[in-house]
Design a protein with these regions (language model features):
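N-terminal capping segments
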Residues: 1-78
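Generic structural motif
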Residues: 10, 81-82, 96-98, 178-184
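Low-complexity, intrinsically disordered short peptide segments enriched in small/polar/basic residues
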Residues: 15, 145, 157, 178-181
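N-terminal compositionally biased, intrinsically disordered segments and leader/signal-like regions
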Residues: 23, 91-93, 167
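Short, solvent-exposed loop/turn elements at domain surfaces
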Residues: 27-29, 156-159
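...with weaker cross-activation on analogous glycine-rich loops/strands in unrelated enzymes
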Residues: 65-158
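Low-complexity, Gly/Ser/Thr/Pro-rich intrinsically disordered linker/tail segments
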Residues: 151, 163-195
């Protein structure tokens, strides 16, 4: 469950972003981080995940004074949900498919892609593995507790939310059983950058 490197600056940065925006930002499909400056602020799932990851990776680079994460890897995260999963999985050589996802294999800062039905908009934009939603696992710097942060457009409390990981996994059990969940570890990009 734990990553081999602590990534404290990354962890703290993601947590600060989550604390700042959870419950205060709505959801709008196709809107990335620029939507945070709108009134009211909005962002979609891939925009939120990209913001969390790139800000965390930049913070880790600054804290260490070196390129722990490459600019090319961070740039590749500016994509749709399926492409983010594809890029991280391809670049790290690590992707867990539903049946291989367990407490023992789950990365500390997992990025999770889900196939959430067959939305009409996806007909014109085919998705790798059918992934139409993405979420990011973040950890509380105080106690290490894992949470899922996501921007979601559902009918209940749309926008950025924060859910304890165990609760989120229980709510997502049907996706896991149906083989509609994929997990990657974006922080494995660090070992790639360091050669």
């Amino acid at each position: 469950m734990n990553s081999p490197i602590a990534f404290k600056a990354a962890e703290q940065t993601m947590w600060r972003l989550v604390q700042r925006y959870t419950g205060r930002v709505g959801y709008r499909r196709g809107v990335k981080s620029e939507g945070l400056s709108l009134s009211p602020p909005v962002i979609d799932c891939s925009g939120w995940t990209t913001l969390l990851l790139t800000q965390a990776m930049q913070a880790e680079n600054e804290a260490t004074g070196r390129a722990v994460f490459s600019a090319d890897d961070m740039l590749a995260l500016h994509a749709w949900s399926d492409r983010i999963i594809e890029e991280i999985g391809t670049r790290t050589g690590f992707i867990l498919e539903a049946r291989k996802i367990t407490a023992d294999t789950f990365p500390r800062y997992a990025t999770i892609g889900l196939k959430m039905g067959e939305p009409e908009w996806a007909n014109n934009h085919p998705r790798s593995r059918g992934i139409t939603h993405i979420v990011q696992v973040v950890c509380s710097p105080e106690d290490g507790a894992q949470f899922v942060s996501e921007s979601y457009g559902g009918s209940v409390s749309p926008g950025i939310s924060l859910t304890p990981l165990t609760e989120w996994l229980a709510l997502s059990e049907n996706h896991l059983r149906a083989g509609e969940m994929w997990v990657v570890d974006p922080f494995r990009l660090a070992s790639k950058a360091q050669g």
